[in-house]
């Protein structure tokens, strides 16, 4: 249509500029045709626009009707679902409200992450709605623990009387723990007939906390027990308690026996469920710690490497407390892996000066380390000892010369005969490995000592080449020293051969 309008404008301009009558008639005819064509085109476009508008209106109306139908269906489904959820919540609240005042076994998560079940009293139902692990609606119950073992479990006396001035967060004691209703278990009553020697129990102390202990003796006539408490002072370790101040604990072995004898008992079922939950939690925690150890930085120095000189009681205690080798310290295994090194800073220097010294040493973090200083001092001391020993061995006086030259031959021969006789008579197979190691070290020292004596005799021969008599004695002494050295070397060879036969062999397939 734009092209037609442009052609019409061009034709009109040509009419204004043309004077020829024939051309003007042709242009007038062309202008008339273009005007008719434009009029027809406008009418056609108007009709098409009206039809398209009608189609869009119809589609819009259809879409609105479908949306209304979907909204009505969703509203109906939501109303039905809301009614079902409201009915479910109503039934749950009615069920839990009926349990208010009843005793149960409720979970408690300690500050270090461990989960344990304790007997508790249900004192209320919380208004908040939660979703449990099975993606189901649930409510929380407010419980007070009957046998609190830690301060955060101890009920507040003022709260029970309705006079506590602090809220639940600021109060040192418990205003009731909130636990999911689906996690509570059956109440475990105390089994007093189980009170016997070495029976583990919880005993109520004057601080209202229940401490672990073991029964020493039980008097069922007077309903009293003498209990040895764990972790108490020596004077207060053994105490007498009434039966109502004790709660017998069930060990894993006894729990397994009772579950075999009466598997249908609700008491045993609840204890089995508690133990299975605890086993699952411990297994999950251990697997998480092992997985964490695989991604932990492996230092060059092993944690506890100093215990190679001891019996390793520290590592054994840490392993008993649950430490896994390769992980960091702490209950989550995210603590330090390498031990903290002691640092000794220069006396009378500021921290800035110490930092400058460390930067001058290329930022060495162990520049002030105590271990490095001790190792450096040990190396200096070893070098000084070696130099002092070398000076002592090289220094000779008149008495040492006379002892070595005049009396050394007979004594050395006598010692050599004794060493050879001992090497022949000893049955090496009857000695232990430790004895063989000690004997190997002693023989090696004797060989080194004998080699030094031979070197001294050779020096004396070179120094006294003109004295014939002294030369004879020195040759005899040198021959004797060489025989003793050969005997010691043969004995060392037999020792090494015996030690080699006792080593574990590795077979290659």
UniProtKB/Swiss-Prot annotation:
Pfam families recorded: G-patch
Pinpoint the G-patch domain residues. 310-356
Basic and acidic residues: compositionally biased ranges: 411-420
Location in or out of the cell: Nucleus
ZnF (C3H1-type) spans are 155-178
What GO CC terms are in its UniProt record?
nucleus
Where do the coiled-coil regions begin and end? none
GO molecular function terms noted in the UniProt entry:
DNA-binding transcription repressor activity, RNA polymerase II-specific; RNA polymerase II cis-regulatory region sequence-specific DNA binding; zinc ion binding
Q: Which intervals of the chain are annotated as region Disordered?
A: 253-277, 409-430
Please explain the role this protein plays, according to its UniProt record. Answer: Transcription repressor.
Name of the molecule in the record: Zinc finger CCCH-type with G patch domain-containing protein
Organism listed in the record? Drosophila persimilis (Fruit fly)
